[in-house]
Design a protein with these regions (language model features):
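N-terminal segments that cap or nucleate solenoid repeat domains
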Residues: 1-51
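Start-of-repeat signature of ankyrin repeats
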Residues: 2, 36, 70, 111, ...
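Register-specific detector for alpha-helical tandem repeat solenoids, activating on a conserved position
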Residues: 19, 53, 75, 89, ...
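Ankyrin repeat domain, specifically the short helix-to-loop turn at the C-terminus of the second helix
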Residues: 22-27, 54-62, 90-102, 129-137, ...
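Ankyrin-repeat boundary/linker signal
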Residues: 32, 66, 107, 140-141, ...
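Eukaryotic helix-linker segments that join adjacent hydrophobic helices
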Residues: 33-36, 40-117, 121, 131
Length: 222
């Protein structure tokens, strides 16, 4: 269990108290809440950049810790509504510097990884950072069979899905058997978006029959 003083320090961003506790007992930093959260998870959720950097310097293993929902501190930072993407970007750099690719690629209980969450949360720049740092994030699908590309197209994030299209083995599937091309049409995305996806259809979307008549794309789903 987590020391209550450490819990309070993580929630409030009191790095001085955290360091005091760790000085007397370094193992105190490994304590968790009943939900499996470490002090790094908690400080990430609350957006305490300084606390996070200080505690990571004392115990780097916290970066790879997952809670009961299999969320890493990186995912906690991405999904928290209280924080900017600055902290998540800082986490990402730390993961890369320490060669923690496995932790970056971690999928939570719902099958979502940090890229799924970044796109769904509207963090487009962070999504592009994640893709550049770890292209393999593009291969994962969640429990609803949604790929990062599918979610990006549903959100009409052209810059994100175009970057994903540059990755040869990036997955494109979505829920109920749909794919990113289906999503573009169903979502009423711009003709430009559909045209871009069409260029890759022969490689990625073989289950979708496509015909071109003039400037109109016709899609036959089965």
């Amino acid at each position: 269990m987590m020391d209550s003083r450490l819990l309070d320090a993580a929630a409030s961003g009191d790095a001085t108290m955290m360091k005091h506790l760790a000085l007397h007992d370094p193992a105190v930093l490994l304590g968790t809440t009943p939900q499996g959260n470490t002090c790094l998870h908690i400080s990430a959720v609350h957006g305490h950049d300084g606390f996070c950097m200080d505690v990571m310097a004392l115990n780097r293993s916290l970066l790879s810790a997952v809670n009961n929902d299999r969320e890493t501190p990186l995912v906690a930072a991405v999904t928290s509504g209280r924080t900017s993407t600055t902290l998540a970007s800082s986490f990402l750099r730390c993961y890369r510097d320490l060669h923690l690719s496995e932790a970056i690629l971690m999928q939570d209980k719902q099958g979502n990884n940090a890229l799924h969450h970044a796109i769904r949360s509207g963090h487009r720049e962070l999504a592009l950072e994640l893709i550049a740092a770890e292209p393999a994030l593009s291969k994962a699908v969640n429990k609803y069979d949604e790929s990062p590309m599918f979610i990006a197209v549903m959100r009409n994030y052209k810059d994100v899905f175009e970057k994903l299209l540059e990755i040869p083995d990036s997955t494109h599937g979505g829920m109920k058997g749909y794919n990113a091309l289906h999503a573009a049409v169903r979502n009423g995305n711009s003709g430009e978006t559909c045209q871009v996806l069409y260029l890759f259809a022969s490689c990625f979307f073989r289950e979708t029959k496509i015909c071109v008549r003039g400037d109109v794309l016709l899609f036959f789903w089965f």
